[in-house]
Amino acid sequence: MSSRALGSHKGSKARRLLCYALAGVLASAPVSARVESYQSDLPDIGTAAVSTLSVAKEKEFGDAYMRMLRASKPIISDPLLNEYINGLGHRLVANANDVRTPFRFILIDNQAINAFAFFGGYVAMHSGLFLHAKTESELASVMAHEIAHVTQRHLARSMEEQAQTSPLTVAALVGSLMLAIAAPEAGIAAAHAATAGSMQNQINFTRRNEEEADRIGIETLARADFDVQAMPRFFSRLADEYRYASQMPEYFSTHPLPASRITDSRARARQYPQKRVPVSPDYQLARARIVARYSGIASRSAMDWFERRHKEASPAEKQSLNYGMALLDIDARRFDDARKKLTPLIKAQPNNRFFIDAMTDLNIGEKHYDKALSRLKQALNHQPNNRVLLLNHAYTLVKAKRGDDAISMLERYTHQHPDDSNGWFLLQQAYESTGTHRDGELAAQGERYALRGQWDKAIRNYTQAAQLAELGSLAQARYDARLDQLRRQQARFKALSDR
C-alpha cells in the first residue's frame, strides 16, 4: 500500500504559500539561520543560551510547522517507510544524550539530497538520501547528525544569537529559521537583506553547530552499534560526486561541507574500534521501495536499475531487488510477473511486512480480497497492534466494499493514532463507501484538514457534520465538543504570530 493508495498530499504552488504561514505570520526576520554558512564563532558548547524559547514553546512551534509541512510539502505517507524510518530514528534516539522531547521522523518525496530538523523533535529526510546512502549506517549518520541538532537545541541557540543583535520578537526569529530550513532560496534572500555583521555572526554560529552535530552524531552512532566510518565516508563520497557540479545539492546550502569538516569527522571516527556491521535487509527493502515508487525514475529505467544490480548481487541482496521489481510489476498491472517474484519471498519469510504489503497490493489488484484478508488476519494474530498491518487490513476492507467493518476498525485506529492522516483518509473512504454516514465522512475529512493546519476548513466540516447528526444524539455532542477543541487550537496557532 503506497502513498498513492492513501491519497498522498502534494503541495501545489498555491499551497506552498502555506509553508510560509508560520514564516508569513512569523517572518519579518532578516537573518537566515542555516544558509551558506562556512566560518566559525560560537558560544561555549556547555553554556547554550536558550532563554529565548522554552522546550514547551519549541513543541508548540514544532507542531505548527509540522501541520504546515503536511499542507505544503509532498510528505510520504507510506506506512512501511514511515515504520522503517521511525524505527531507525528511535534506535538512534535511545542512544542519544540530552533527549528532552519525543522524536518524530518524516520522509519528503524529493530526490534532492537533504535533511533537516526543527522544533519539537521533528526530523525530516528527503527520499533522495536513500538513492545516495549505500548502507543503513550511512543513512543513520545523517539522522544522528539531525538528532544532535535537536538535542543541542541549535535552533533555539541560533535564536538567542540573533536576539542579541536584532530587536526581533520570538515569532519573527522563529520565522527566519523556518524560512531558511523549508526554503533555502528564500532564506538566502532574507539573509542578503541583513547587515554584513549580522550575517557573519550567523555564518559563524552555524558552522560550529555543524561541527558539534557531527561530533555528537558519531557518538550516537557508536552507542547504537552502527558503523561510525559511515559519516566521513558518506560526506567524502558526496563531496567527490559534486566536486565539479555546476549546481550543488540543497544539502550543501544547509549543511556546509568544507574539507576540514570531512577530515574532522574522519579523525573522530578513527577513535572508535572498527566494526563489521551486517547488511540491513530492512534498509535494502526500504531502498528498493523508494526506487520503485518514490524516486522520480520512470518505470522502465527503475527496472533497468534493479536488473543491473541483480547480476552481481548476493543472494540476500537479490531478495530486495526482486521485491523492488515486483512492486514495479504490480504498479504496471503485470500481476503474473509480480507473483513469480513475490511467491518465493513470502514463502521464505511469511511474517515480513514488506512482502505481506506487496502481496496485499497484488491481491487487491486482482480483486482477490479474501486472500489478502486471510493473510492479514493471520499476520495480525502475531502482531495485533502493528500499524502497517492494520492499515493494510482496513484498506483491503474498503476495496472489498466492506465499509462497516472498515469503519469499526478505523474508529479504534484513529482513536489510538489521531496524528496519522492515513487512518483518517481510510475512515473517510469507508464512510463514503457506505453512502449512509455523510456526517462521519465530513468529520474524518475535517481531521485531515486539522492535521494540515487548515482550521477554517476543519471547523466548516465539523459544523456541517453536527448539523447532519441526529438532534441530541451522542454523535452531535461529540462533533460539538470537537468544534470547541478546534477553535481553541486555531486560536493557539494564531497566537504564535503575536509573540
Residue ranges: model-predicted function:
Residues S72-N82, N95-F105, M159-Q162, A186-A189, ...:
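Surface-exposed patches in mature extracellular/periplasmic domains of secreted proteins
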Residues S2-L6, K13-C19, L26-F116, E241-R243, ...:
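Hydrophobic or amphipathic, alpha-helical segments that drive membrane association/targeting
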